[in-house]
């Protein structure tokens, strides 16, 4: 019995992606005339027959690239490795495969494209964690690869993105502290360093305003430089609030260590809440109240969107907010 020729077989022969072959055979834009002619000629020579729509849906598989900046892997190693594993599992469920590229800071600064794109190894791309706008624009301008942003967004670039509801999560945490009797509440995170920190800060501010409070600048503590995420030592204010809302669990654990080092006990003297519900063992000596990010749903949504883009055109669906879950533990005291 003769072997059934698939689009992936043609793609392998010409060292292009399956999406390129699909576009060429269906006369879609995004493929040069020369490459289109090569693909069609080879398809005839190999005896390729276009499958029915039902057969195509069942058999189609894709190579999905994931790029993540190296500083995210270094600083948030466990969180982003877990997110990558979730992407992997979501891809396997959709008959697809994932390849990871860690982008170093020098290549990002020099606008050197990812190898996965330069070598045409992938059919679609998930950008995980965030890259500088200039780099994202370079990718969008030079490559027609379907793309989804995961765990960040960039308002300067029209692209599909999947993010946790940072604003609502931080708003919920701050409201919880007010409900526990706290009136003097600080925030830890460098505002404008990342979109997620800024959104979490704004959720904190909304709660303050609704409770008749204004922001005290000395209670908003930077935790990193403004470039993005080179962490820096922060100084506690002279006049202390009774609670801190932290932009992530890792930073919350650092705040708790600094408080303990200075002589404060958590939650007896100061209450602390985090964000993410992802903290590897040994970083914190107390179970932390936090807002859990739904990594499974975020990853599944990103893969589903990307596959839809790879099979159904380039129409943008915008931002997808994935709700998380408030988790009460032992890092907050009622006063």
Task: Outline where the language-model segments fall.
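N-terminal helix-turn-helix DNA-binding module of bacterial transcription factors
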Residues: 1-60
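Hinge/beta->alpha junction and helix N-cap segments in small-molecule ligand-binding domains
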Residues: 69-82, 100-108, 162-172, 188-231, ...
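Short acidic capping loops at alpha-helix termini that bridge into adjacent secondary structure
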Residues: 183-184, 215-218, 266-272
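Alpha-helical recognition/docking segments in bacterial nutrient-uptake
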Residues: 1-5, 59-175, 234-239
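Flexible loop/turn connectors
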Residues: 231-335
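Short helix-capping segments at alpha-helix termini
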Residues: 93-94, 208-215, 238-239, 261-266
